[in-house]
């Protein structure tokens, strides 16, 4: 399975049209065969970063499915759709992600992904993009497997997230050493404490992820992303 991760800088006045294009066009068209499915349609929460940044994540069965989809956008039935969508956004930045071997989200049965636009309560996600130190990609991934992932399974008064997926940039990406941690925010009411108070010493001292991970990375970015009510996987 491959993931097509795209960040769209949308024209503010055309935001609703852009959303409709993905719901009624992209999602519905991909549902006609077994190559790909839209998994998520998300907004960067206002007040946490650039305005009108929307994120879409599309799953592709394999490399052949990616080639077929790319060809459809380049010169096939999705060419006119892509041209219309370009009128609704200023820019789009995309990358292909691969799940790491131990990622909870690894192989998705695309046939089970909803494509009918059924609605649900919006879900909040935290997407952490980390860039390990030079030549330390494998060491970062191993430390994330043995340290970070188990730490999220420990339920405490500070628990916030559930780890849903761990992905790395595919060959040819602009930044090879990139890892994406895809997490659901289970306790949104605990976010203010994260923003308004310094982390206590006991969660950033030796033996903690915040401390020990500095051996392999000190550069990462977090995004708070809210799903649309019709986003297929919530």
Positions of predicted regions on the chain:
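An amphipathic, aromatic/His-enriched active-site/gating alpha helix that lines ligand/cofactor pockets
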Residues: 16-41, 46-51, 59-100, 146-162, ...
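Surface-exposed interaction/gating patches
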Residues: 5-14, 101-186, 229-234
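Acidic/histidine-rich, surface-exposed loop or edge segments in extracytoplasmic proteins
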Residues: 2
């Amino acid at each position: 399975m491959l993931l097509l991760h795209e960040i769209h800088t949308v024209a503010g006045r055309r935001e609703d049209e852009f959303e409709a294009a993905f719901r009624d066009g992209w999602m519905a068209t991909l549902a006609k065969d077994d190559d790909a499915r839209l998994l998520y349609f998300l907004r960067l929460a206002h007040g946490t970063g650039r305005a009108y940044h929307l994120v879409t994540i599309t799953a592709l069965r394999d490399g052949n499915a990616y080639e077929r989809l790319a060809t459809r956008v380049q010169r096939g039935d999705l060419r006119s759709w892509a041209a219309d969508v370009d009128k609704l956004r200023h820019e789009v930045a995309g990358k292909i992600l691969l799940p790491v071997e131990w990622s909870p989200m690894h192989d998705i049965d695309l046939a089970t992904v909803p494509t009918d636009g059924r609605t649900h309560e919006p879900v909040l996600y935290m997407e952490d993009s980390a860039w390990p130190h030079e030549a330390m990609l494998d060491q970062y991934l191993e430390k994330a497997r043995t340290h970070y992932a188990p730490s999220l399974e420990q339920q405490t008064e500070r628990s916030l997230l559930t780890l849903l997926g761990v992905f790395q940039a595919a060959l040819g990406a602009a930044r090879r050493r990139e890892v994406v941690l895809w997490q659901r925010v289970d306790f949104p009411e605990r976010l203010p404490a994260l923003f308004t108070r310094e982390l206590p010493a006991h969660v950033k001292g030796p033996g903690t992820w915040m401390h020990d991970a500095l051996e392999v990375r000190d550069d990462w970015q977090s995004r708070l992303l809210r799903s649309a009510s019709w986003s297929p996987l919530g």
